[in-house]
Amino acid sequence: MLFNSFVFLLAFPIIFAAYYLCPIKWRSWLLLLISYAVYMNWVPVYALILLWVTLTTYTGARYISRNSPKNKLKMTVAGILTLLPLLFFKYYNFINNIVYDILTPLHLRIEINTMHWAVPIGISFFSFQAYGYLADVYYRRIDCERNLRDYALFISFFPQIASGPISKAKDLLPQIKSLKTFDADKATQGLQLLLWGLFLKVVLADRLGLYVDSIYDNYTYQTGFSLFVASLCYSLQIYGDFAGYSLMAIGVAKVLGFDLINNFNRPYFATSITDFWHRWHISLSIWLRDYVYIPLGGSRCSKLRTYWNIFATFLVSGIWHGANWTFIIWGIIHGVAQIAEKALRLQKYEGSSKIGRA
């Protein structure tokens, strides 16, 4: 059930009324039920994957929170089990094709069937959110959550599960534990964000998409100027699509009394690649900084090691965006560009989510 669908426009007023008419002590249960119902609206059986990730990280964090010399092993096992569904559903065919391409010139043939299952909606987002919670418990940034209902809602919270933003436990769990009464001003702000997000997605992105697709589908017959204009329009299209959906998620959450992180901050006004990543998909940039870049050593090491840490972080970013060489190369280009900026001291920092500092 996408926010720009007719089904959601019919369902949300009912969700809104049911949520605020429900006694506060039962609202978490109601919201959890709604979140799973919304998720099962896509492919019902995939709710089992959501449940797997929830129970794996909930149980893993409980074990990790016990001070033990084997905590690193526990974190490794729990982390692998958490990311296993993501690796299987999103990257199985990609890895399968790589193995095939390597073995074929060697005249070695291993027949491995291609998987034809659809990738579960939002698996990249809720898997990263769950892993982030696990890592925060491991690094003693937060205490483990003992209330399974609250934790399950943190992972499955329906406004953000399909396309983010990726929330941290320290930001969202306290809000789940202290649900508020109806706030008219906050709800008004939420509706404004929802409508602006709808405009960006439906009016801007979807309309531009029609033009961009018509050019790219017949690119061999297009002039250089047409391809240039289509590329500019595509930049606006992906911004409207992603930022619009993020704004809708933030707006829906705000109507229900929750505050989610702002995911975009005028990215095309950035003054450098580094600044761009402080403004574009901010919640992912923060996640990569906290759970990839800093654990690798961040900038508190030699220059060469720091450059490698930046490169590895953006390589992970490219892989996360899609199981395709295009995304991997895209991640490498951004990583190399940011390394060049750092080496030549061309960075201009604006914002708080800095990859390149730790």
Set out the residue ranges of the language-model regions.
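Membrane-embedded transmembrane alpha-helical bundles that form the catalytic cores
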Residues: 1-357
